[in-house]
Amino acid sequence: VIARVIAAAGDDGKLERARELGADEVINYTNENIGDAARALTGGRGVDACLEMIGGDILIQSVDALASGARMASIGAHGGEKIELDFVEFFRKHISVHGCGRSTKAQVERVLALMAEGKLKPVIHKTFGLDEAAAAHEVMESRNFFGRMVLTR
């Protein structure tokens, strides 16, 4: 086994989709604390790597889920929330958290090449015309989607 994938989401429908896409375990963060649940799923150890995409309290819970020596990449905090983190945990557990923003041109080219080779398949919730941009934004604000929304001409 190369990796055991644990996915977290706020509703069971999204968790079911995550299982369909290959998640081995799922955590509903509406009902469970991510750190507690991740440790329960890993025999108390925590996770070695985490991709966090929401920010706020979910980021804090994700840091709590990390094992000693783990790494986390965060592309969350889109709402601009300010949070408090206990940096003693970072030192004690030797963890690192990387903030991720825009992709570089080289990264985009690599992703496009993987897609062209059929090795990476994007999950698309819905495609909208440019004249439907407001409707696409409403769907995003509702958080009632799984995958990406695509705008086309």
Question: PLM features: residue spans?
Answer:
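Adenosine-nucleotide cofactor-binding segment
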Residues: 1-61
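Glycine-rich phosphate-binding loop and adjacent beta-alpha segment
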Residues: 12, 53-123, 153
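Generic structural signal for individual residues within well-ordered alpha-helical segments
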Residues: 16, 35, 91, 109, ...
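Residue-level recognition of specific faces of alpha-helices
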Residues: 17, 71-74, 148
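Short, hinge-like loop/turn segments at secondary-structure boundaries
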Residues: 23-27, 45, 89-92, 114-117, ...
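CheY-like receiver
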Residues: 37, 41, 65, 114, ...
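C-terminal capping/lid region of NAD(P)-dependent oxidoreductase domains
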Residues: 44, 119-126, 135-153
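A conserved short coil-to-beta-strand element within the FAD-binding core of flavoproteins
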Residues: 129
